[in-house]
From Swiss-Prot:
Lineage start: Bacteria, Bacillati, Cyanobacteriota, Cyanophyceae, Synechococcales
PANTHER family hit by this protein: TYPE III PANTOTHENATE KINASE (PTHR34265:SF1)
Protein name per UniProt: Type III pantothenate kinase
Subunit composition and interactions: Homodimer.
The entry's keywords: ATP-binding, Coenzyme A biosynthesis, Cytoplasm, Kinase, Metal-binding, Nucleotide-binding, Potassium, Transferase
Organism encoding this protein: Synechococcus sp. (strain JA-3-3Ab) (Cyanobacteria bacterium Yellowstone A-Prime)
Gene: coaX
Function: Catalyzes the phosphorylation of pantothenate (Pan), the first step in CoA biosynthesis.
């Protein structure tokens, strides 16, 4: 099989963005992100494997389009309403880095999801992410501005002296304090095993969490890696035309 035939696409379809991952076989070679309202288009006769985790419209069904479901992710003991993105990220983390493992996915919602040494779901937590907390203050107060987050900016002072810095301080310091508490509890239960940070805000949070644990890693593409793993398990190998 040629390298061109091995190229395929994975997509994580959310509420606000679609993240594309170009693969050559099992290797992730390129990642792109587009607004969710933009119509999905890709080269003809290219496999597309989708994880729909939001309300954005999906492409029509075709032999080239595969929409993954929670039941296709070989994570042990998931509950029925577990988010597909959480399951894919956790399973990908476990098979790539080892079990037990904990994934902190810092997206629109920030989630913590953990599995034990057998790859069985332990459970997790969901809370508003950095952007959602900032947006809530801007939307539901009369005079507080909407603040933006810069991964390269220093952590704001705890006792800020202007409104924007005070908002960043309140959100970031309380979020980090909560994550420290969750990580400490996880380590009491599972003293060994990797901890993974992923998601759009993970780049900002990771430097502040990294000193807490030697096994903490940053992997921005866990959900795409999970899609690739499921493709390996479930894809139908097409025979060349005329083959018996």
């Amino acid at each position: 099989m040629s390298s061109e035939a091995e190229r395929w696409l994975a997509a994580v379809v959310g509420n606000t963005h679609v993240r594309w991952g170009w693969f050559a076989g099992e290797s992730l070679v390129k990642v792109e992100q587009f607004p969710a309202h933009q119509p999905l288009s890709w080269p003809e006769e290219t496999e597309l494997w989708l994880a729909a985790v939001g309300s954005a419209p999906l492409p029509p069904r075709s032999p080239w389009v595969h929409c993954l479901e929670l039941s296709q992710v070989p994570l042990r003991d998931p509950y029925p309403s577990l988010g597909l993105d959480r399951a894919l990220a956790l399973w990908a983390a476990g098979i790539r880095y080892g079990w037990p493992c904990l994934v902190i996915d810092a997206g629109t919602a920030l989630t913590l999801t953990g599995a034990d040494a057998e790859g069985s779901l332990v459970g997790g937590a969901i809370l508003p992410g950095l952007g959602l907390q900032a947006q809530a203050l801007a939307d539901h107060t009369a005079r507080l501005p909407k603040v933006e987050w810069d991964p390269g900016a220093p952590i704001p002072p705890r006792w800020a002296r202007n409104t924007g810095a005070a908002i960043r301080s309140g959100i970031l310091h309380t979020l980090l304090a909560g994550l420290r508490d969750f990580l400490a509890d996880w380590r009491r239960r599972f003293p060994q095993g990797p901890l993974l940070v992923t998601g759009g805000d993970g780049e900002l949070l990771y430097p502040h969490l990294r000193p807490l644990d030697a096994e903490l890693r940053w992997d921005p593409h866990l959900v795409l890696r999970g899609i690739a793993g499921c493709r390996q398990l479930h894809r139908v190998v097409r025979k060349p035309s005329g083959a018996e």
